[in-house]
Amino acid sequence: MSREQLSQEIIEAGRFLYGRGWSPATSSNYSVRLSASEALLTVSGKHKGQLGPDDVLATDLAGNSLEPGKKPSAETLLHTQLYLCRPQVGAVLHTHSVNATVLSRLTASDHLVFEDYELQKAFNGVLTHESQVVVPIFDNDQDIARLAANVQPWLDAHPECAGYLIRGHGLYTWGARMSDALRQIEAFEFLFECELKMRTVMNR
C-alpha cells in the first residue's frame, strides 16, 4: 500500500474506535508498518475521531520522528518494539475503553484468562473455545522505555499473545493488517465486558 492508503487506514480506524467509545478525546494511538525500517503513527495530542492526513507521521523503529515539526506519541516505543520483534505485525492499536481501564484496575493478578468463549476464535491461531486466551497486565509507567522493557520478556515468551493491558490505562493489540487489529479490538472488548458482567452477577 502507498503511504496515502496507509494513512487513510489510520484515519478510518480512529473514526471507528472513537465512535465505539474506545478512544475518547485525544487518548489512544495507532500505527501501521510503512517499511522494514519505518512506521506511520498518529501525531501526539490529536482527537482520534477527527484525524486528517496531517495527523500522522513517519518514524524510524527507534521511535524518532522523520518529519520535522511533528511529534509522535509518547508511547511510540510500545509500537515500534512490536514491529522490531514480530516481523509479521503490520498494525498496532492502543485504545482507552472504559471496560479495559476498569477491568485492569479491578484485577489484582498480573493477567486475565478467558476460556470457553466462542469469540476467542476471533484471535489469530485460536481454533476452539476449548482454549485459553491469556492477557497480561502491566503496571502503568510514565517511563515508556522502562515499560517497554517490562513488556518485552512476555512478548518473547508468548508468541501467541495477541494483546496486553496497561493497568488503569488501556489495551494494546496488533495484527498483520489493520483489519486484523480492529477485529481483535472488538473481540477483546466483548470479552472484557463479559468478564465485568460475570463479576457483577457472581459478586466477585
Swiss-Prot record:
Reaction(s) catalysed (UniProt annotation): 5-(methylsulfanyl)-D-ribulose 1-phosphate = 5-methylsulfanyl-2,3-dioxopentyl phosphate + H2O
Protein name: Methylthioribulose-1-phosphate dehydratase
Native source organism of the sequence: Pseudomonas syringae pv. tomato (strain ATCC BAA-871 / DC3000)
Gene coding for it: mtnB
A Pfam family of this chain: Aldolase_II
Positions bound to Zn(2+): 94, 96
PANTHER family linked to this entry: METHYLTHIORIBULOSE-1-PHOSPHATE DEHYDRATASE (PTHR10640:SF7)
Record bears the keyword Lyase: yes
NCBIfam families: PRK09220.1 (NF006672), salvage_mtnB (TIGR03328)
A GO biological process held by the record: monosaccharide metabolic process
Function text: Catalyzes the dehydration of methylthioribulose-1-phosphate (MTRu-1-P) into 2,3-diketo-5-methylthiopentyl-1-phosphate (DK-MTP-1-P).
Cofactor binding summary note: Binds 1 zinc ion per subunit.
